């Protein structure tokens, strides 16, 4: 599907493996508890600084969440002393507060030189936003070569659109030099809307063509209206350009709204068919609609059309279809392909599938034995070495959900469970709060167990009836 740059990545750290240095987590935890209990700011900062002084890198994620746009002084204390994390988060702070771009770039380059490979992804994103894709790819390749998964994804995505992006660069230079003609201007705006999904920039270029009812210009206007919570006005525009021009992106918007609001799959499919488009966004969504209509062969055919054009997002849908149809090998193969192209979601899916296969193998092995051994507490620990390796990579790339999942690969009471869930809790992951509650419950630490379980519940996690009673007593 079309590419969107989500700033959720801004607080995704490149975290070191949990088997490495564990210093600073006691202070980090005190700081975390202080934040959740709304303790004095001086006490909280003291704990965060102590953790950072002990070379703990996760604390910078917590500081970023807690301090927000007030964190510059904190980051300044640890410049050149934190393997690039202070520089990284100061750059994020400046980005949030509209700081000077040159300073942001210098900080990120310094961060990368100190070993924080996540900075390469952010540098690539900055140049992508300026339509300087060649420069972006230089940074993303460095991140990719270092194994930074978001760089891997973006590099492969951009590589798939190399010709388009080269043309955008060429035309954008003409726009800046004021040597672009109207035909080229229309082409540039259209490419930015359709291939980059940057509606504001695309609209700024295409608004001169609104008077001629140019579909991409009207579409960009409608997308901006939606961002302004003017959905009815946007839908009117989608209807207009679909009825008059069968514009494929308008058709996609209308079809997706039909599915979301009324589950009218038949009408949605008619709209998609009427676009007469073979763009991945259309064929991929057709696959989704056919799957919901239980026409699985047609779903597969349309998913494959998008996958053949290297649409990484649709690979996940195709893998899920194969899983639901019991075609495990096909599911594993497509998830593996998407994961190697940088998809975090594919990594999740693949790890879950590998674990399920491992559990089934163990179950079959036990069933074939005459005498089943008494169940051991270690039986609850997840077993797949392949799945664990994938999750370790996702943790290394700063994904908090993988931190939580990886903690399930350690036996009850293992200190790695605490460390992994503290990493995720530093990003306010509610499952991590619950897991910490259970960890301390098993350690007979009633105070901390109740504290984390209450926090998990307050953040919407279902802690179950047993722990509901426990925290009340």
PLM ranges: what are they?
Residues 32, 64, 92, 125, ...:
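Residue-level recognition of tetratricopeptide repeat
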Residues 35, 95, 128, 160, ...:
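Position-specific recognition of the canonical hydrophobic site in helix A of tetratricopeptide repeat
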Residues 38-39, 70, 98-99, 131, ...:
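Residue-level detector of the short coil/turn that links helix A to helix B
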Residues 44, 71, 104, 136, ...:
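Single-residue signature of alpha-solenoid repeat helices
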Residues 48, 75, 108, 140, ...:
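Hydrophobic/aromatic packing residues within the alpha-helices of TPR/SEL1-like helical repeat arrays
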Residues 54-57, 81-84, 114-116, 146-149, ...:
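Short helix-capping/linker turns of helical repeat alpha-solenoids
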Residues 61-62, 89, 122, 154, ...:
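Canonical tetratricopeptide repeat
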Residues 374, 447-473:
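Terminal, low-structured helical/coil segments at or just beyond the last alpha-helical repeat
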């Amino acid at each position: 599907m079309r590419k969107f740059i989500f700033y959720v990545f801004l607080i995704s750290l490149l975290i070191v493996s949990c088997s490495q240095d564990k210093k600073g987590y006691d202070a980090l935890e005190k700081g975390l508890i202080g934040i959740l209990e709304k303790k004095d700011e001086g006490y909280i900062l003291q704990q965060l600084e102590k953790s950072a002084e002990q070379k703990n890198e996760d604390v910078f994620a917590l500081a970023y969440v807690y301090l927000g746009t007030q964190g510059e002084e904190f980051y300044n204390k640890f410049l050149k002393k934190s393997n690039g994390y202070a520089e990284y988060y100061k750059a994020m702070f400046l980005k949030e507060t509209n700081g000077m771009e040159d300073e942001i770039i210098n900080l990120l380059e310094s961060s990368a030189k100190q070993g924080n490979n996540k900075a390469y992804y952010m540098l690539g994103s900055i140049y992508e936003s300026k339509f300087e894709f060649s420069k972006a790819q230089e940074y993303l390749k460095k991140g990719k070569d270092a194994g930074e998964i978001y760089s891997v994804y973006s590099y492969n995505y951009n590589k798939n659109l190399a010709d388009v992006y080269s043309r955008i660069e060429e035309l954008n230079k003409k726009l800046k030099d004021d040597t672009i003609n109207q035909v080229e201007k229309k082409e540039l705006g259209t490419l930015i809307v359709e291939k980059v999904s940057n509606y504001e920039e695309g609209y700024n270029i295409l608004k001169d063509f609104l008077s001629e009812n140019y579909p991409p210009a009207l579409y960009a206007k409608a997308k901006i209206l939606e961002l302004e919570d003017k959905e009815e006005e946007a839908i009117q525009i989608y209807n207009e350009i679909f009825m008059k021009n069968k514009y494929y992106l308008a058709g996609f918007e209308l079809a997706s709204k039909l599915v979301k609001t009324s589950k009218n799959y038949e009408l949605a499919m008619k709209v998609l068919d009427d676009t007469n488009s073979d763009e991945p966004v259309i064929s991929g969504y057709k696959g989704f609609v056919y799957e919901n209509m239980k026409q699985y062969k047609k779903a597969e055919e349309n998913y494959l059309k998008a996958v053949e054009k290297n649409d990484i997002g649709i690979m996940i849908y195709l893998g899920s279809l194969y899983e639901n149809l019991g075609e495990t090998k096909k599911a594993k193969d497509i998830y593996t392909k998407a994961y190697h192209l940088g998809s975090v979601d594919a990594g999740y899916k693949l790890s879950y599938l590998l674990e399920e296969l491992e559990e089934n193998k163990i179950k079959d092995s036990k069933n074939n034995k005459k005498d089943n051994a008494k169940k051991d507490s270690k039986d609850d620990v997840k077993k797949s070495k392949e799945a664990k390796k994938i999750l370790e990579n996702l943790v290394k790339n700063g994904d908090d959900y993988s931190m939580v999942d990886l903690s399930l690969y350690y036996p009850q009471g293992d200190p790695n469970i605490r460390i992994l869930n503290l990493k995720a809790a530093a990003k306010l992951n509610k499952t991590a709060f619950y897991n910490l509650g259970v960890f301390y419950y098993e350690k007979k630490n009633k105070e901390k167990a109740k504290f984390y379980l209450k926090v998990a519940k307050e953040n919407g996690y279902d802690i179950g009836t047993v722990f509901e009673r426990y925290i009340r007593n």
